Amino acid sequence: MKRLLAFSVAALCLPALMLAQPSDGSKQVEYQFTTVKANPITSVKNQFRSGTCWCFSSLGFLESEAIRLNNIKDTTLYPDFSEMFVVSHSYQDRAEKYVRLDGKLNFGAGSECNDVLYVAKHYGLVPQGVMPGLNYGTELPVHGELDALAAAYVKVITSNPNRVLSTAWKKGFQGIMDAYLGECPTEFTYNGVKYTPESYRDSYKINPDDYVSLTSYTHHPFYEKFALEISDNWRWEQDWNVPIDEFMAALDNALENGFTVAWGTDVSEKGFTRDGLGILYKEQVKKTSGSDQERWVGKSEEKNDEPQAPEEEVADQEYRQKGYD
């Protein structure tokens, strides 16, 4: 069976012009982009005030895969998978693991792409309209209360006040998920067809076992699998470790041949902006103090009326490893 790549980006396709927007009234830095390859993608969804970016982005990848696998040309027929169906199953599995490990596991909103593939494989998928996951009075996800309540619940369970776990604790946690996100359906009718989550997934020819996950680090041998040591990889799923040049070549090859990709990254770095830019600054630019404009272009002794783009870092294998370590 042909194995596909899962490391996530929807398409190598960007607008022709994007602007670095300083907040001090100075001129914008303009970046010109050229579309090299545009593969079919679904619309960008709003995770709003939830920590479930991993689910929104990875389901976007699976939606693009459904388009490709079924050769869907009509955009009105593009799938829209329910994020909160995946989130509910993920949280419930994480709660069980957290309790098994006596609380020695990260219990938060974060996760990664392999989690979505796991849920799709073991529980299936459902349409957004069947489980919108908004049972708490807002039109967009707001998970502060849900996350705090879920974390408090599992902490109480692991404190073991009864000296033995009750038979009710899993149902109690599921009740929290059901109250906020809605019950995960085991059967539903959509567009006149009756499905289970598994049969709905299969109707789009999605097989989670067809995908492989790649990473690139030097603290493990290349061409072997290992579980990346980050707190969000709470399922301890394993990735194939390859040299960074091969990692990027695999990405380029996938995109060029019509495949979309799931790319996991940390968007808390300063180089990410709200208007859609991601720039890996040179270290001295990161440390530049002063105005927002100075952080973008670096402070110069000579005034320049034209804003200058910040110097970018070249991320080689050593640089990547240093950032991880």
Identify the role of each PLM range.
Residues 16-22:
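Boundary at the C-terminal end of the N-terminal hydrophobic targeting segment
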Residues 1-4:
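Positively charged n-region of N-terminal signal peptides that target proteins for export
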